[in-house]
Amino acid sequence: MLYNNYKDIKLSRLGFGTMRLPVIDGKINEDETIQMIDYAMENGINYFDTAYPYMSSKSEVVVGKALARHPRESFYLADKFPGHQIADSYYPEKIFEEQLSKCQVEYFDFYLLHNVCETCYDVYTDPKWHIIDYFVEQKRLGRIRNLGFSTHAQIDTLRKFLAEYADIMDMCQIQLNYLDWTLQDAKTKYEIVSEYNLPIWVMEPLRGGKLVNLKDSDKEKLASLRPNESTVSWAFRWLMGLPNVKVILSGMSNMEQMIDNVSIFAEDKPLTDAERDILMDIAEGMKTGVPCTGCHYCCDSCPMELDIPLLIQQYNDLHFSASFTPLMLIESMPEEKRPSACLGCGACASNCPQNIDIPNVMSMLAEELSQRPSWAAICKQRAEEAKKAE
């Protein structure tokens, strides 16, 4: 297993993310999960990541049960405070104590503010809820060894949070892979976090499986260069080449994935610059959808002053893969800035160099959002599941 130094400890470069544990009959397959965690530890993985809502609020319990069979000093456990779910945000003391109990530990090695983003920014930072102050105090007391945050936020929100709180954060977890490097401008996020000297943890390294199932021509291109490397290996090795990435989390769902990933992280085989360029070319070919370049010419003539490129980006993201991020972002906007506020006047389209039928895209996005459960409804469902899990 490859390791990175972090402060005075060695962290496995591969971390076990427990958001996609094996399931049988609609419930977590505890036996297989325990086997996977045992195998992980036997083969050098020492970082385990869970969160309050994972697996219908059952992940913490099963992970805690599995890890409790091992010496506490033999693993590093990360959990997260569900401030992004709003309904749970106002009780940090209650939730933190509950998480410690569910995980059967007296402290968390890493504890993160879960998905600091536009929807929940004010909840996390409002002094009257004392959320951040509470967890800073828990760190002082030794019940949290390292305090950090995960985020799917837009760049301006990330900058704002770091400007205010970087000095009390130990690490940052972002969605990062060779596709989102440009698709979601993860490159800029990586650079911003690095400017604040915060080490980076990676989530969604395979883009929810999108980078596993490449089209045949792309697979053949990679196989011609590294015949014995899988598409999974290419994605991981691209991330290993980023110097500020400390831990790469993988949400493994079965023993086969675990064995494969462990073998990849057994040896460092850096990609050449030419190989990295090939992955960037493959990523560009994967970008289907509305061909917006983000020039913002359309915004100059919009009577509603909509951020059209941002809305189109959310439209493309919704169509590319299942994700809550677009829902959360759009729901954080005032009603008059959402796609449903588009008047359909067409002034924007006449200024678009790509000849995009922008009013039609806004209409389709508004319709699609109306057919999906709101982020608030999703949070309510998660809260109900959490109560049942108690």
Language-model features, listed with the residues they occupy:
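Active-site groove signature of glycoside hydrolases
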Residues: 101-123
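N-terminal binding-site loop/beta-alpha segment at the start of enzyme catalytic domains
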Residues: 1-75, 134, 140
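Active-site mouth loops of central-metabolism enzymes
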Residues: 19-31, 80-91, 119-124, 153, ...
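Short, acidic/polar
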Residues: 27-40, 88-104, 153-162, 231-236
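Beta/alpha (TIM)-barrel catalytic core signal, keyed to glycine-rich beta->alpha loops juxtaposed to Asp/Glu
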Residues: 116-306, 310, 320, 324-334, ...
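Conserved, mostly hydrophobic/aromatic
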Residues: 16, 33, 40, 48, ...
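Short Fe-S-cluster ligation motifs
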Residues: 320-347, 371-390
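Acidic (Asp/Glu)-rich catalytic clusters
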Residues: 6-10, 42, 64-74, 97-106, ...
